[in-house]
UniProtKB/Swiss-Prot annotation:
It catalyses: 5-hydroxymethyl-dUMP in DNA + ATP = 5-phosphomethyl-dUMP in DNA + ADP + H(+). Phosphorylates 5-hydroxymethyluracil (5hmdU) into 5-phosphomethyl-2'-deoxyuridine (5- PmdU) on DNA as a step in the pathway leading to thymidine hypermodifications in the viral genome. The phosphate is added internally to the DNA polymer. As a final result of the pathway of hypermodification, 5-aminoethoxy-2'-deoxymethyluridine (5-NeOmdU) substitutes for about 40% of the thymidines in the viral DNA. These modifications probably prevent degradation of viral genome by the host restriction-modification antiviral defense system. The keyword RNA-binding does not apply. One of its GO terms (biological process) is symbiont-mediated evasion of host restriction-modification system. It comes from Salmonella phage ViI. Residues 260-304 are annotated as: Disordered. This is 5-hmdU DNA kinase 2. Belongs to the thymidylate kinase family. 5-hmdU DNA kinase subfamily. The keyword Metal-binding does not apply.
């Protein structure tokens, strides 16, 4: 029963941070396998696979060329490396066809009808999805966030897409209804909607065929993405002794938030680049060290 969790929204809303928060918690219990893909003569990282959960996080750890901080990047890296949205979607489809649940995050190329419910249900072998959007309420908060994240002033291109994501969220909700999904729960004036299929049990997240669409604020708790993934996986997590209450506690004690000149909790996940050999009259051979290898979301935000 393949599923897909898609996280997209305005730049700097902490999408990747919330994804990697769940990854790092899983790594305290399970050991992932690193996946790669090859296009032409280039082999690149594809993601991390947790076989016990049949779960793949598309992406890789990286270092920001703006802030110098370690982070998680997902579809943006594949789009940039291949220069093709079609190749990226084919890679995703290949793993979904094998029954894996995939977590894909990114922007701006995911602001597309091909990352909305209608296209995904018609082109991917999936039973359900969670589609989470993140946005800012105003430009002031966007500018402040970008300065704190990169140490530089925000540009206009990222902000211009903020309104576009809000409009796309409404389109996605309309597509779910057109596809025959019924609204099970509608919270916060349509900002968090749970859907079920007519032929399934109407209890939220009990059948494994429930989907969710949510528009979340940029300052939502660190656990909101992990919570959505957890519920899509259902009993698989509990069968592996992965309890949601433990994840909430991990978010409190081990936040993956980072700051220029401050915390950089993922630095150890990114291998240091070998230093270039100094130039001398006699050229030395530089050796590179080997590399180490149902409850709604917005409702849960009030749990504290």
């Amino acid at each position: 029963m393949a599923k897909i969790i898609v996280i997209k929204g305005t730049s700097g809303t902490g999408k990747g941070t919330r994804v990697v928060q769940f990854i790092e918690w899983l790594r305290t219990k399970l050991k992932p396998t690193e996946l790669s893909y090859t296009v032409g003569d280039k082999t690149r990282p594809f993601g991390l696979k947790f076989e016990e959960l049949k779960l793949i996080f598309v992406g890789q750890y990286t270092v920001s060329n703006k802030s110098g901080l370690a982070s998680w990047t997902s579809m943006d890296a594949i789009h940039a490396a291949t220069g093709s949205g079609d190749i990226a979607r084919d890679l995703v489809k290949g793993w979904l066809a094998q029954g894996y649940t995939l977590v894909c995050e990114g922007e701006p190329l995911m602001l597309s009808d091909k990352w909305r419910p209608e296209w995904m249900f018609k082109n991917y072998p999936i039973d359900s999805l969670a589609l989470l959007y993140f946005a800012y309420p105003d430009r002031y908060q966007y500018d402040a966030r970008i300065r704190g994240r990169s140490g530089k002033e925000a540009g206009d291109s990222g902000w211009s897409r903020n309104e576009s994501y809000s409009k796309e969220f409404e389109k996605s909700k309309a597509e779910m209804l057109a596809l025959g999904w019924n609204v099970a729960v509608d919270d916060y004036s349509g900002q968090d909607v749970l859907y079920h299929q007519t032929a399934t049990n109407t209890q939220e997240f009990k059948t494994g065929n429930d989907s969710e669409l949510a528009m979340l604020p940029f300052d939502a708790p660190l656990w909101v993405v992990g919570n959505a993934i957890y519920h899509q996986l259902g009993t698989v997590c509990r069968a592996n002794n992965l309890m949601s209450k433990d994840f909430y506690g991990y978010c409190e004690t081990n936040p993956m938030t980072r700051e220029v000149g401050g915390q950089d909790p993922l630095a150890h996940r990114v291998p240091e680049k070998p230093q270039k050999a100094s130039k001398t009259k006699n050229k030395a051979v530089a050796k590179e060290e080997p590399k180490t290898s149902s409850v709604s979301l917005l409702g849960l935000m009030r749990k504290a």
